[in-house]
Amino acid sequence: GSEMCIRDRDIKNTTGATRDAFRRVQEQTARPEAVTVDLRQNLTAATRKAGGDDLPTYTGHLYADAGGEFPADLNSWERAVLETEAARPTFVAWYRNPARPTPASLRIAYQDDSAAWGSLQVDFLVVSRRSDGTLGVSIIDPHGDYLADTRPKLQALARYAELYGDHYVRIESIVKVGDQLRVLDLHDPGIRAEAMEFDGAQVSALYEGSHARDYR
């Protein structure tokens, strides 16, 4: 891995403002315990895939090397989501939420269909600048709809949005349906209710329906 230093270019309006914005992001592991995301000053990131090839690098990450790049292994629609987010005029930085539950990851507890507890790590946290100049954080979670735990994870995110939505600018769950990325806006109470009540086998039905819209 290579040592990544905290990225402060383009995001320094007050000292540590972006990191502080993340520190205010709270998550629910088991109610009523709320925990903050622990963002360290430095991060060690892998720069090669398991096979030895170099990982592609991306700009705009909260942590970056001296050249402003961060290595990440993203699939095609994660890349598409990242490109869409980075092109927004309000975009400041992005954070790849660690895939494993660590103090540096946003973790949301969920129960699967067998009532076993698991931990949902959403994909991206995106920092943006609000119209009043303050920084805010969004949860942007592109994911597959083919895993057995997709529905309980979506429902956990909907429940989390119900409890903590006011901490975030946006909370969006994204799935690819055919060739089109579709998004559920979990700030919307009606969409949350639809997700919470859904008991079908294929979560993609939610993203194909009228509650979802094309992600762009």
Report the location of each language-model feature:
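Electrostatic, structured charged patches in enzyme active sites and in nucleic-acid/phosphate-binding
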Residues: G1-R216
